[in-house]
Amino acid sequence: MSEPQKAAAPTSALDRYFKISERGSSIAAEFRGGLAAFFAMSYIVVLNPLVIGTGADASERTLGIAPVAAVTALVAGVMTILMGVIAKQPFAMAAGLGVNALLASTIATTPNLTWADIMGLVVLAGLIMTVLVLTGFRTAVFEAVPESLKTAIVVGIGFFISFIGLVDSGIIRRMPDAAGTTVPVSLGAGGHLLGWPTLVFLFGLFFTIALFIRNVKGAILWGVLASTALSLILEAVVPSGSVKESATGWSLNVPSLADMKFTTPNFSLIGSADLFGAFSHIGPLAASLLVFTILLSVFFDAMGVSVGLAAEAGTMKDGKVEDIDKVLLVDAFGSVIGGGASGSANQIFVESATGIGAGARTGFANIVTGVLFLLAIFISPLVTIVPFEAVAPALVVVGFLMIRQAVNIDWTDWGLGIPAFLTIIFMPLSYSIANGIGAGFVAYTFIRLVQGRGKEVHWLMYLVSAVFVIYFGMGIINGWTS
């Protein structure tokens, strides 16, 4: 966990408002952090349209690549700035990959459901979360979690973002089903590290580690910039192309210094969500179950990510995230606004840890990140120049920084150690923060009951554990109701 430096006296109104000096930071550090966070997150403007922009709904309508890209950048920019201004935390926001994958798969498998319908359900989930925050329920759940489980969430997120970095950079690859093997992943292509993009990742990883060891300020950002420069040179001299063309290609976008060009954004999706359409098209029960699924995923993702990021940024006091009620309120707005713009629920992005690793400690870094997202609406190369292989090393290094907190977990108490272990291991292996939290919560309440120490468990933990049991059993429930 990062320790804030000794606070200096505020030098301006901006400094006082964002608590820059109070948190031991500086304008320069916040700029570095904001830039690093944007570079780590900008891929979402490319990826989100591919996830939800191409699939046809029941009316044979697609959202479209260009409109989704426009609203993805717009809502990410607006919500990130709002989080910085209102909550004053360096927690950037964008369309959540878990939720958008859920929406895409639901559209593909549910007859009579349209994109307008399902985006309306996202808005409803956001409105329910807003009510839960305003009534204090969401914050109460947050505070009912034992400290060891909160620490386990931080460690689990550390493993998760490191795993994301390794997988999305191609160092660890998913094994194709046709391979006929029970091994789900392998090292590189066919068990070997191949290709220039892999070299960029390895260079970035060891260069960033070296900068950290030498205590260079902005090590994360310098690592991303140096890796990006190397990727541009390599692609110009020895083109690798996309991974779609070759197993040794770039994983998401091919780095290139294309001419800066201004594009006219397409905002036609804004306001197209149908709040109650799903209830008439697929029935009240099925629609309610979908709202519940979306709500639970977003609800606990935010809780876990905010704990992890605040612990790394040093913005926790007495085991609580500073201004957590404001953090959760803005996060709830992210689903309302994201769904209303048909860009999917916007959530606190775990890649914000990259910005924190580069020096971000306050909401001012969010202003930098948010403005860059808004510029990306009009200037296309902003989100295509940096390949994921240049950003992935930062995720791995920041993951290591978060994993170090495992020493603060009481592993000698089975009632804390086993739930902590399940929380940690479920996050990367199920590719879901919410799943890890749920596994830990259910195990915690169960083991405490077996130990005869059930009275030590907060009643909200019993309630939330019961909800997670229902959530994990949704497949069975859907089978009964279909």
Which role fits each region the language model picked out?
Residues 2, 75-97, 128:
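Juxtamembrane transmembrane-helix boundary signature
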Residues 2-66, 185-189, 224, 228-325, ...:
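Helix-loop-helix hairpins and the membrane-proximal interhelical loops
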Residues 22-34, 61-69, 73, 114-118, ...:
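Hydrophobic, aromatic-rich alpha-helical transmembrane segments
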Residues 31, 51, 141, 218, ...:
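Residue-level signature of catalytic and energy-coupling elements of molecular machines
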Residues 35-42, 78, 85, 162, ...:
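Hydrophobic/aromatic residues within the transmembrane alpha-helices of Major Facilitator Superfamily
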Residues 72-84, 104, 158-162:
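A generic, lipid-embedded transmembrane alpha helix
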Residues 111-233, 367-482:
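Membrane-embedded alpha-helical modules
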